[in-house]
Amino acid sequence: MNYLNKINKINNKLFYSTTSSSNGIKNVVINNKDYLKSLKTNEIWELIVGIEVHAQTKTKEKLFSNSLNIGSMEGFKANSRVSFVDAAFPGALPVLNDKCVEQAIKTGLSIGGTINRYSFFDRKHYFYQDLPQGYQITQLTEPIVKGGSIELELSDGRQHQIRISHIQLEQDSGKSIHDLHPTKSLVDLNRAGIGLMEIVSHADFTSSEQVGCYIQKLQHLLKHIGSSDANMQFGEMRCDVNISVHKPNTEFGTRVELKNMISAKAIVSSIDSEAIRQIDLLENQNKIQRETRGFNQETGETYHLRTKEDEVDYRFFPDPDLPPLIISSERIETIKQQLGELPQDMKKRLIKQYSLTNYDAELLIQDQSIAKFFENSIIFNQNHNQKQRDIKKILNFLLRDIFSWLNSNNIQDFNSIINENQLSIEKFTQLLDLIEQGYISSNIGKTILFQILNGSDNRSPKDLIDSQGLSQISDDSLLDQLVQQLVENHPNEVTEYHQGKQRVYKFFMGEIMKKTKGRSNPEIVNNLLKKYLDLKKK
């Protein structure tokens, strides 16, 4: 996710979606609860959604083999990262990757779940070309994590809690490729056997907005604690969604599963689309069939994939090749201590400690390295016995200018800029000092900041400014002469200004900045302009 998108998602309150077609739906809130209103009949319906998120564990090797976990890395030859275990060669036995266990524990602790000290692995049987074993190793009876919750903040300020049922460890499948041969489907097993955390929610969602918020928040949490890269565009985080609708105060409807959603936008759109389909069927006295469906992003409609299997169809039984997974309480406590500050705890602290707005704090915690840089800038200032810095100016540089530069240069990781010494805390605070001292204007400061970020010149901010002659002009006599001459040379604009056309004032400011190449002190120019324009008032 790029940095401008992070800002836009927060500005737009994250994925809020209302369908407005003639046979569509409208989100409504009644007594602090979300409902759907049919635009065709004006009847009120309740939407119920549950989500299964499959997030690849961030580990060097796969779940049960020593094959490289390629994750989102591109460029690997098909079937080049496959062991005998991954390909299900007879006699090849699985060996559990302990790092996958650690990542699942971290995830469970971060959502307030209970770590199951005794968990087991089961075999889930089904036949598909990219599942060479004929079964998936998963955890049905005793998953590694039980319980937990995630708090959502909705667009209208309401809080909504999503309960987590459990998290289970399981294998990812391979990939079926259908577009490389005109008559054959090909199989790539590089992904087969990568560790997955299946994070299963309760059916606590009652709007597509809640789902969008949840996906974004869970994705951010997994990245923050380092248990998964969770990049949906690379398939590192995929979602299955269960949807049903019913009239308020009646029994839940028949649920339909939407399979393998790989973008938050698609998930939200598919929920609205499927809700419309189900409501339309029910309003026409038809029944909902229990099935698995896909979503066509081009048409915006869901489509039938297959009849939904029951649990008995998978013939679950304990995996005889894997012993019980036993986790000591000491290990759980050690991992808990290593977790560090979680995003929501950080947000609350930033608001309290620095008097930040909810909006600014939310933006900062989107990237842990940005938040750390913000705090280090303040600490650096305090350690050098300087006066309290204007926090808003730091935020403007970080959340507006630096985010803008990162986005325009297609850089996803702010931390890489720091690691490559393009932007140090010292340079950043020096630049802020020069602006506060009036040595340069904010606009020139932005120019210098971008030069530093580009990494082409390692000189200090002041040396960069002086070498280009960009220091601010604060000479009263020089600016007085420029302003007086400008006003004298533009009598028509002066008349328009006194007729109430305030845009003309911007014209005068712009002309002065143009003549001084943006270096004139705006405060001095502003005072001089008012002085000479008032003198011309008849």
Curated annotation (Swiss-Prot):
Catalytic reactions of this protein: L-glutamyl-tRNA(Gln) + L-glutamine + ATP + H2O = L-glutaminyl-tRNA(Gln) + L-glutamate + ADP + phosphate + H(+)
A single Gene Ontology MF term assigned here is: ATP binding
Q: Which GO terms describe its biological process?
A: glutaminyl-tRNAGln biosynthesis via transamidation; mitochondrial translation
Origin: domain of life: Eukaryota
Q: Can you tell me which residues the record assigns to a coiled coil?
A: none
Q: What is its main location?
A: mitochondrion
Recorded E.C. number(s)? Answer: 6.3.5.-
The top EC class, named as a word, is ligase
> Where is this protein localized, as stated in its record?
Mitochondrion
Listed Pfam families: GatB_N (PF02934), GatB_Yqey (PF02637)
Q: Report the GO terms under cellular component.
A: glutamyl-tRNA(Gln) amidotransferase complex; mitochondrion
Which keywords does this Swiss-Prot/TrEMBL entry list?
Answer: ATP-binding, Ligase, Mitochondrion, Nucleotide-binding, Protein biosynthesis
Q: What cystine pairs are annotated? A: none
Cited Gene3D superfamilies: 1.10.10.410
Q: Which family does it belong to?
A: Belongs to the GatB/GatE family. GatB subfamily.
- What is its biological role? Allows the formation of correctly charged Gln-tRNA(Gln) through the transamidation of misacylated Glu-tRNA(Gln) in the mitochondria. The reaction takes place in the presence of glutamine and ATP through an activated gamma-phospho-Glu-tRNA(Gln).
Subunit note:
Subunit of the heterotrimeric GatCAB amidotransferase (AdT) complex, composed of A, B and C subunits.
Give the note: This protein may be expected to contain an N-terminal transit peptide but none has been predicted.
Q: What is this protein called?
A: Glutamyl-tRNA(Gln) amidotransferase subunit B, mitochondrial
Query: Can you name the source organism?
Result: Dictyostelium discoideum
